[in-house]
Curated annotation (Swiss-Prot):
Belongs to the universal ribosomal protein uL4 family. InterPro entries: Ribosomal_uL4, Ribosomal_uL4-like, Ribosomal_uL4_dom_sf. PANTHER family: 50S RIBOSOMAL PROTEIN L4, LARGE RIBOSOMAL SUBUNIT PROTEIN UL4M. GO terms for biological process: translation. Keywords: Ribonucleoprotein, Ribosomal protein, RNA-binding, rRNA-binding. It holds the Pfam family Ribosomal_L4. Gene3D superfamilies: 3.40.1370.10. SUPFAM superfamilies: Ribosomal protein L4. Part of the 50S ribosomal subunit. Residues 42-65 are annotated as: Disordered. One of the primary rRNA binding proteins, this protein initially binds near the 5'-end of the 23S rRNA. It is important during the early stages of 50S assembly. It makes multiple contacts with different domains of the 23S rRNA in the assembled 50S subunit and ribosome. The gene is rplD. The lineage of its organism: Bacteria, Pseudomonadati, Pseudomonadota, Gammaproteobacteria, Vibrionales. This is Large ribosomal subunit protein uL4.
Length: 200
């Protein structure tokens, strides 16, 4: 199949990478797994055994008229422990390479179908200036876009850093979440070829 390239000849690409059927269940599973893996999982609360103090019985068992109590660190008490205390945990889910690649192919194919993938011959800025990048994006009528380049472009990455709903990455930096998070994806021809090789 062929992809239209702005300002250049059409690019011949693999049907299996950019023309496959959309697998919603697979994409959902991989996106959820990717987001789960990004969770810190460092929250921690103390159980009744971990809260300091509470060694002595607050008052005697009988004769006070109050409810019996054995420790001031019971979860019933205001300064007590937490009944089912949250503990640090690993939220990551296992995703096979085949599934991950399949999800990326599925997303890229859907972007092509919805005319959300824009391919240009080359895209760069001369200096790390946000103003320069804004002008370039205005020419292409883009405001909510992920820019993917074939190689690390420090000037472009710095220029995009301060823009809302604009991100710039090289091919190694793309993932399922970033591809679905933006309205449009702008790729250079070199990036398209690299993605194709990566997912072959």
């Amino acid at each position: 199949m062929e992809l239209m390239v702005k300002g250049a000849d059409a690019l011949t690409v693999s049907e299996t990478t950019f023309g496959r059927e959309f697998n919603e269940a697979l994409v959902h599973q991989v996106v959820v797994a990717y987001a789960a893996g990004a969770r810190q999982g460092t929250r921690a609360q103390k159980t009744r055994s971990e809260v300091s103090g509470g060694g002595a019985k607050p008052w005697r068992q009988k004769g006070t008229g109050r409810a019996r109590a054995g420790t001031i660190r019971s979860p019933i008490w205001r300064t007590g422990g937490v009944t089912f205390a949250a503990k640090p945990q690993d939220h990551s889910q296992k995703v096979n390479k085949k599934m991950y690649r399949g999800a990326l192919k599925s997303i890229l194919s859907e972007l092509v179908r919805q005319d959300r993938l824009i391919v240009v011959d080359n895209f760069s800025v001369e200096a790390p200036k946000t103003k320069e990048l804004v002008a370039k994006l205005k020419e292409l009528e883009l405001n909510d876009v992920l820019i993917v380049t074939g190689e690390v472009d420090e000037n472009l990455f710095l220029a995009a850093r301060n823009l809302y709903k604009v991100d710039a990455r090289d091919v190694a930096g793309i993932d399922p979440v970033s591809l679905v998070a933006f309205d449009k994806v702008l790729m250079t021809a070199a990036a398209v070829k690299q993605v194709e090789e990566m997912l072959a």
